[in-house]
């Protein structure tokens, strides 16, 4: 799908952050693993969340969805699978479910779309082989079989926290205690603690023995509960950058106290010189001069694409470090954003996981043709921010990629002054 994004009027208005995709994944799985009825409210049925709900229904739960909520009734047992579990393009769904699959007493196969089956699973591969379990991955899918055993687990702390969260879901249900030793540095710690927080709401506990070691008591049970998903800082980063550049934007629906790692966007924007206040009522942005900064992306890689846009629109140079994981997402996000921003006159370069972006707002221009969305939701949304921030109409392909995380994105930005034309 092609969309053209342009300014219908000067940027300004109020936008509500969508529900947190990260927290919704976790709540759905905890509810599915509990025996009984849980009610999850403030949901948005993106493709990723729909994949997790579908997997829960295949494995161990009855699921009924409403307009913005779901009732998940955990069966208290796993059911025989008649077909592979389709994770669509959701890395969280796949990586969270692999250890859970080891609880089912059967071989479980997973399929996916796009680049999902190309994304590395070496952490689980090594762990399963170490325990003598089956782990087979190919371009067509992934199959695991065999039961994890309680005990000592050692994982690199600088891999995706999704692997650690996946083990956190499954290990409390084993018969004995387990310990997760994370080899420092531990990145994305906030996402580990987010998993633990949602688990605690469903009655499952773990605790830090020290900054790198998690103790997970065995023999626990998830208990059903009612759970409300808070607003998503990862998605709010797009209107936040727009507000920082243009002013006049207010974001509502975000909890001031949160475990979401991408809440770091507010601290990062303050360092750029952005002017805003945060209250329970919302976050209003006022236009102010912005200057380049040095950013460590290790704990918040999803912010990378939109921060590359911001780097072009401020004075000076922005250096984004520890961004290697961007190359292993729905697209190679570094290469994708470099190509599209250069097509608009952007000046930037990368080496490995370091990206250098030069402020060049006065040199930006309309591209010669259609920009490519690279089938990546964050690339598409970042290019929309570029269009509205600069007043340069942009036509982007693969625009349907937004359904992965924020299906209503284009409608949501219209009250901020956007005009969106579909083709």
Show where each model-derived region lies.
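Short, structured segments at the rim of ligand-binding sites
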Residues: 1-423
């Amino acid at each position: 799908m092609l969309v053209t994004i342009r300014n219908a009027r000067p940027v300004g208005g109020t936008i509500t952050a969508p529900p947190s995709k990260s927290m919704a994944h976790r709540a759905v799985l905890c509810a599915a693993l509990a025996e009984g009825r849980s009610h999850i409210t403030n949901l948005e049925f993106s493709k990723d969340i729909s994949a997790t709900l579908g997997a829960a229904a295949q494995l161990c739960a009855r699921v009924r969805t409403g307009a913005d909520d779901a009732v998940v009734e955990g069966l208290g047992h796993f059911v025989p699978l008649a077909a592979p579990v389709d994770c669509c393009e959701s890395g969280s769904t796949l990586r969270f479910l692999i250890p859970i699959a080891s609880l089912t007493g059967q071989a479980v196969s997973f399929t996916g779309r796009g680049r999902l089956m190309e994304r590395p699973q070496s952490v689980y591969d090594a762990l399963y082989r170490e325990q003598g379990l089956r782990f087979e991955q190919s371009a067509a899918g992934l199959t695991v079989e065999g039961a994890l055993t309680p005990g000592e687990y050692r994982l690199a702390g600088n891999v995706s926290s999704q692997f650690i969260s996946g083990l956190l879901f499954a290990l409390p249900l084993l018969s004995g205690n387990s310990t997760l030793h994370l080899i420092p540095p531990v990145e994305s710690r906030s996402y580990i603690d987010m998993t633990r927080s949602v688990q605690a709401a469903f009655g499952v506990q773990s605790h830090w023995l020290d900054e790198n070691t998690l103790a997970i008591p065995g023999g626990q049970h998830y208990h059903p509960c009612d759970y409300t998903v808070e607003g998503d800082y990862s998605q709010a980063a797009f209107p936040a950058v727009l507000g920082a550049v243009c002013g006049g934007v207010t974001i509502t629906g975000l909890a001031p106290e949160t475990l979401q790692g991408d809440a770091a966007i507010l601290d990062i924007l303050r360092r750029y010189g952005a002017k805003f206040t945060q209250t329970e009522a919302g976050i209003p942005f006022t236009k102010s001069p912005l200057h380049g900064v040095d950013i460590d992306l290790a704990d918040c890689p999803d912010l990378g694409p939109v921060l590359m846009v911001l780097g072009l629109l401020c004075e000076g140079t922005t250096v984004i470090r520890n961004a290697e994981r961007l190359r292993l997402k729905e697209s190679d996000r570094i290469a994708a954003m470099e190509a599209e921003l250069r097509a608009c006159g952007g000046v930037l370069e990368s080496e490995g996981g370091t990206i250098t972006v030069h402020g060049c707002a006065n040199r930006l221009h309309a591209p010669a043709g259609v920009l490519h969305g690279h089938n990546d939701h964050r690339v598409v949304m970042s290019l929309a921010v570029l269009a509205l921030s600069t007043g340069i109409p942009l036509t982007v392909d693969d625009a349907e990629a937004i359904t992965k995380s924020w299906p209503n994105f284009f409608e949501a930005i219209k009250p901020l002054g956007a005009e969106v034309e579909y083709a």
